[in-house]
């Protein structure tokens, strides 16, 4: 069901999904505005194939985002919403110590290119929180600590110089009804003179008293979204044995969430 609080009045404006992947963001946008995105762009044929299967009404471009001309794509129609979720692995703390790719770290500049070319009324970018540390790489191919965040500030400044009001917030989807506690950065830019409005949390930590006091719904768990009746091979039946580190993590999880938990996590099969 659509919440009137979140419906964007896009009228006849186009909705564009850059870095569309298999369509996760497009599905969320469709739930929010009540229709499919108009254009989806991604370089991966398999991802675009999956997106086409789930969003047949959408116009698809299987290409590098920098090779797609915004003016040619939009055919003179106004763009109401441009959504971008560029590759995050070269910013994420989960990446480890491997050198970063300068090309991948520069993907977000495509947003500025679209802003210059067709001036979308609203721009949204989603990424890991470390995206705010975007800066130049040193000679060793790793981010330069002394210039942390420099490129990110330049990127935001470029949008503001084009007439956009820009705001950034770190949000967790679990506070809005999705079963994940991961924190993500959301950047919203508008050039229509209207204020940027952020949603108020609808869900909260069930262990905290303020969740009930504020009338919030308890966080959902991933277990609620899994059909446990589906036959699935056991992780312990793999041909390749599990690594010792993996086994230790499993053991720690059993201790924490089953043996020592106030409410042990158990699934009836």
Residue ranges and their predicted role:
Residues 1-43, 47, 49-76:
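S-adenosyl-L-methionine
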Residues 15, 40, 83, 124-125:
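Generic enzyme active-site microenvironment
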Residues 27-31, 53, 113-116, 157, ...:
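Short, well-ordered alpha-helices that flank and scaffold nucleotide-derived cofactor binding pockets
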Residues 36-39, 59, 165-167:
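Conserved beta-strand segments of alpha/beta enzyme cores
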Residues 46-50, 107:
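Conserved short alpha-helix immediately C-terminal to the canonical SAM/SAH-binding motif I
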Residues 68-81, 88-238, 266:
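Class I S-adenosyl-L-methionine
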Residues 248:
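Residues lining hydrophobic/aromatic ligand-binding pockets adjacent to catalytic sites
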């Amino acid at each position: 069901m659509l919440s009137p609080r979140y419906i964007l009045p896009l009228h006849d404006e186009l909705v564009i999904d850059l870095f569309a992947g298999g369509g996760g963001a497009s599905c969320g946008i469709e739930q929010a505005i009540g229709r499919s995105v108009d254009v989806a762009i991604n370089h991966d044929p398999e991802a675009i194939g999956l997106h086409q299967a789930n969003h047949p009404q959408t116009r698809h471009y299987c290409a590098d985002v920098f090779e797609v001309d915004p003016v040619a794509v939009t055919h003179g129609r106004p763009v109401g919403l441009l959504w971008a979720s560029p590759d995050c692995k070269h910013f994420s703390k989960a990446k480890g110590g491997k050198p970063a790719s300068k090309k991948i770290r520069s993907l977000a500049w495509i947003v500025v290119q679209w802003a210059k070319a067709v001036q979308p009324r609203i721009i949204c970018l989603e990424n890991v929180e470390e995206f705010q540390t975007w800066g130049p790489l040193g000679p060793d191919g790793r981010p330069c600590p002394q210039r942390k965040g420099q490129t990110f500030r330049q990127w935001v400044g470029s949008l503001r110089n084009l007439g956009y009001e820009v705001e950034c917030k770190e949000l967790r989807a679990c506070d809005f009804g999705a079963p994940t506690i991961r924190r993500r950065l959301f950047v919203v830019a508008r050039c229509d003179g209207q204020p940027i409005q952020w949603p108020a949390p609808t869900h909260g930590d069930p262990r905290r008293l303020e969740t009930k006091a504020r009338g919030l719904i308890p966080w959902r768990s991933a277990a609620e979204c899994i059909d446990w009746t589906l036959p699935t091979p056991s992780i312990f039946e793999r041909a390749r044995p599990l690594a010792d580190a993996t086994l230790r993590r499993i053991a720690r999880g059993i201790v924490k969430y089953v043996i020592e938990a106030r409410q042990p996590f158990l699934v009836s099969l």
